[in-house]
Design a protein with these regions (language model features):
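Small beta-barrel nucleic-acid-binding modules, primarily SNase/OB-fold domains
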Residues: 1-161
Length: 161
């Protein structure tokens, strides 16, 4: 995932998980000062949990649940990259490797203090895909994918004699 140089690093505590790639949290500014902010995970997108498409909703709710599970371990690190088009802080979230619950892939971004990127974990586990802020991918359910594959098989196969 391509990243801009980090602006700032903060410790955060969870207030609420909105979906698989957005949270509300308290950001510790130091000197006993905390501010509540909405954080949009930089460089990834997850499927929507509030949609009429039932298949997409299932994937969206799974991403939201995994995001919550990773963050409930306690304090996490936020590396901020400024604000996005909707005024949310764009950031990468880092947690303790213990929060992940399984062996961590080598392609997961790690901070200098050994924390691991939730953004990368969500991609590696199939809960998210890389996203550069442009046009979003349209969700295609597994059923639609299977139907399309079967249709291609019928078209590609020569007629039997």
């Amino acid at each position: 995932m391509a990243k801009k140089p980090a602006s700032f690093e903060y410790n955060g505590t969870l207030v609420k998980v909105l979906d698989g790639d957005t949270i509300d949290c308290y950001i510790d500014l130091g000197f006993d000062l905390k501010i509540k902010k909405r954080i949009r995970y930089m460089g990834i997108d997850t499927w929507e949990s509030r949609t009429r498409d039932k298949n997409e909703k299932v994937k969206g709710l799974a991403a939201k649940a995994r995001n919550k599970e990773l963050l409930e371990a306690g304090v996490f690190k936020i590396v901020s990259y400024g604000t996005g088009k909707f005024g949310r802080v764009l950031g990468e979230i880092f947690v303790s490797p213990d929060a992940v619950g399984h062996e961590i892939s080598e392609n997961v971004d790690k901070s200098s203090d050994g924390l691991v990127s939730i953004n990368d974990i969500l991609i590696n586990e199939g809960h998210a895909y890389e996203y550069d802020g442009g046009k979003k991918k349209k969700f295609v359910s597994e059923i639609e994918t299977e139907k399309a594959a079967k249709k291609e098989d019928l078209v590609d196969k020569p007629a039997e004699e």
